Curated annotation (Swiss-Prot):
One Pfam family hit: Response_reg
Summary of the function given for this chain in its UniProt record: Functions as a response regulator involved in His-to-Asp phosphorelay signal transduction system. Phosphorylation of the Asp residue in the receiver domain activates the ability of the protein to promote the transcription of target genes. Type-A response regulators seem to act as negative regulators of the cytokinin signaling.
The record's account of how the chain is modified after translation: Two-component system major event consists of a His-to-Asp phosphorelay between a sensor histidine kinase (HK) and a response regulator (RR). In plants, the His-to-Asp phosphorelay involves an additional intermediate named Histidine-containing phosphotransfer protein (HPt). This multistep phosphorelay consists of a His-Asp-His-Asp sequential transfer of a phosphate group between first a His and an Asp of the HK protein, followed by the transfer to a conserved His of the HPt protein and finally the transfer to an Asp in the receiver domain of the RR protein.
Source taxon at top rank: Eukaryota
Gene name in the database record: RR3
Free-text disruption phenotype from the record: Dwarf, narrow leaf, low tillering, abnormal hull, viviparous and low fertility phenotype.
Protein name per the record: Two-component response regulator ORR3
Modified residues (4-aspartylphosphate): 62
Origin organism lineage: Eukaryota, Viridiplantae, Streptophyta, Embryophyta, Tracheophyta
Source organism of this protein record: Oryza sativa subsp. japonica
GO terms for biological process, alphabetical: cytokinin-activated signaling pathway; phosphorelay signal transduction system
Record-stated family: Belongs to the ARR family. Type-A subfamily.
Response regulatory domain: residues covered: 12-129
Induction annotation: By cytokinin in roots and leaves.
């Protein structure tokens, strides 16, 4: 009698960025680390995805986006009883200590400075998803 082990499903990351280039970069970095990635181009679309798929293990979002900033998305996620446990990581090309502190105080797990590197992704995933 043999027992089959069912592989663990890949952790699911929602990547949010209005830049197609940045979405592609972060998506490739995450996929190369064996994560399932859904990419969207706005905070509004991210909330739509989250309303349909509760199996998201982490959100990584750009800070500066039109309509809804990454900070606004962070606040909406952390205010939601259903979503507040999902870790949110913000990223920006601007290294603004005030902005970074504000995001961390609002509940962000981390704040990455672009360009995001493979070492950032592995550190993040080990610290945030695997905890």
């Amino acid at each position: 009698m043999s027992t089959k082990t069912v592989p663990e499903p890949e952790p699911h990351v929602l990547a949010v960025d209005d830049s197609i280039v940045d979405r592609t970069v972060i998506s490739r970095l995450l996929r190369s680390s064996k994560y399932r990635v859904t990419t969207v181009d706005s905070g509004k679309r991210a909330l739509e995805v989250l309303s349909l798929d509760r199996n998201v293990h982490m959100i990584i979002t750009d800070y500066c986006m039109p309509e809804m900033t990454g900070f606004d998305l962070l606040k909406r996620v952390k205010e939601s009883a259903e979503l507040k446990e999902i870790p949110v990581v913000l990223m920006s090309s601007e290294n603004s200590p005030t902005r970074i502190r504000r995001c961390l105080e609002e509940g962000a797990e981390d704040f990455l400075i672009k360009p995001v590197r493979p070492s950032d992704v592995s550190r993040l995933c080990n610290r945030v998803i695997m905890k």
